[in-house]
């Protein structure tokens, strides 16, 4: 991957922002006759609708992390390809960039009750400049099973919330949220992400094999 893709890739973080809105509640008292009518006022809710949703989302996220970490099933990762988008790069740059990201990784995974994939992983590979680049994080994919068999052919799409580091930045950890897609059959999957960017920066397809 190119050395300055981080600034542009932060745009991907907007894909994971959640806009929560709280509905307005209004109370109305009417009085049709001079007679005094006593009614019991409903107790106010302990939390607003948005607060409940936010807590539920955060609670679900933590629960998914914990359940995945506690699982005893392991993934193994083999980086196989990086591709710098030829429509967004000068030929002089693509000629010298490395697109064979030798490396290895492993992690834990699980499939939830709906058949969706959750993974915690750590991986290291050779970046565009032939320097070691580590990455680790949490991944989620919504899965589809065209044949109905969860052990057979499957496709997935989702996201990863990761942290990486590069030699250009003295290996200071940096957040890197990215999209994820995959196709798989039985134990083997091909998984990939795309790093967005500008001209001569970012716009890199990164693919790896995942064995489970």
UniProtKB/Swiss-Prot annotation:
<feature type="region of interest" description="Disordered">
    <location>
        <begin position="29"/>
        <end position="50"/>
    </location>
</feature>
<comment type="subunit">
    <text>Homodimer.</text>
</comment>
<comment type="function">
    <text>Transfers a fatty acid residue from the sn-1 position of a phospholipid to the N-linked hydroxyfatty acid chain on the proximal unit of lipid A or its precursors.</text>
</comment>
<feature type="signal peptide">
    <location>
        <begin position="1"/>
        <end position="26"/>
    </location>
</feature>
<feature type="active site">
    <location>
        <position position="127"/>
    </location>
</feature>
<dbReference type="InterPro" id="IPR011250">
    <property type="entry name" value="OMP/PagP_b-brl"/>
</dbReference>
<keyword id="KW-0012">Acyltransferase</keyword>
<dbReference type="GO" id="GO:0009245">
    <property type="term" value="P:lipid A biosynthetic process"/>
</dbReference>
<keyword id="KW-0808">Transferase</keyword>
<dbReference type="GO" id="GO:0009279">
    <property type="term" value="C:cell outer membrane"/>
</dbReference>
<keyword id="KW-0732">Signal</keyword>
<comment type="similarity">
    <text>Belongs to the lipid A palmitoyltransferase family.</text>
</comment>
<dbReference type="InterPro" id="IPR009746">
    <property type="entry name" value="LipidA_acyl_PagP"/>
</dbReference>
<protein>
    <recommendedName>
        <fullName>Lipid A acyltransferase PagP</fullName>
        <ecNumber>2.3.1.251</ecNumber>
    </recommendedName>
</protein>
<feature type="site" description="Role in lipopolysaccharide recognition">
    <location>
        <position position="93"/>
    </location>
</feature>
<dbReference type="GO" id="GO:0016746">
    <property type="term" value="F:acyltransferase activity"/>
</dbReference>
<feature type="compositionally biased region" description="Low complexity">
    <location>
        <begin position="29"/>
        <end position="44"/>
    </location>
</feature>
<keyword id="KW-0472">Membrane</keyword>
<feature type="active site">
    <location>
        <position position="84"/>
    </location>
</feature>
<dbReference type="Pfam" id="PF07017">
    <property type="entry name" value="PagP"/>
</dbReference>
<keyword id="KW-0998">Cell outer membrane</keyword>
<feature type="site" description="Role in the phospholipid gating">
    <location>
        <position position="199"/>
    </location>
</feature>
<feature type="active site">
    <location>
        <position position="128"/>
    </location>
</feature>
């Amino acid at each position: 991957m190119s050395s300055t893709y981080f600034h542009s890739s932060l745009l991907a973080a907007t894909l994971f922002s959640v806009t929560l809105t709280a509905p307005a509640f209004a109370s109305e008292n009417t009085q049709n006759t001079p007679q005094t009518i006593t009614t019991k006022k409903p107790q106010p809710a302990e939390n607003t609708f948005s607060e409940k949703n936010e807590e539920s989302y955060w609670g679900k996220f933590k629960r998914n992390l914990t359940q995945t970490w506690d699982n005893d099933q392991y993934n193994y990762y083999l980086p196989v390809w990086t591709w710098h988008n030829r429509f967004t790069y000068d030929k002089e740059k693509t000629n010298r960039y490395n697109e064979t990201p030798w490396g290895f990784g492993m992690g834990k995974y699980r499939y939830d009750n709906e058949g969706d994939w959750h993974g915690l992983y750590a991986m290291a590979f050779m970046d565009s400049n032939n320097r070691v680049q580590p990455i680790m994080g949490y991944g989620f994919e919504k899965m589809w099973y065209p044949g109905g068999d969860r052990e057979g052919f499957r496709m997935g799409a989702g996201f990863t919330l990761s942290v990486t580091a590069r030699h250009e930045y003295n290996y200071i950890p940096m957040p890197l949220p990215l999209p994820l897609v995959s196709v798989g059959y039985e134990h083997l999957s091909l998984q990939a992400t795309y790093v967005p960017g500008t001209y001569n920066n970012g716009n890199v397809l990164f693919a790896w094999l995942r064995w489970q």
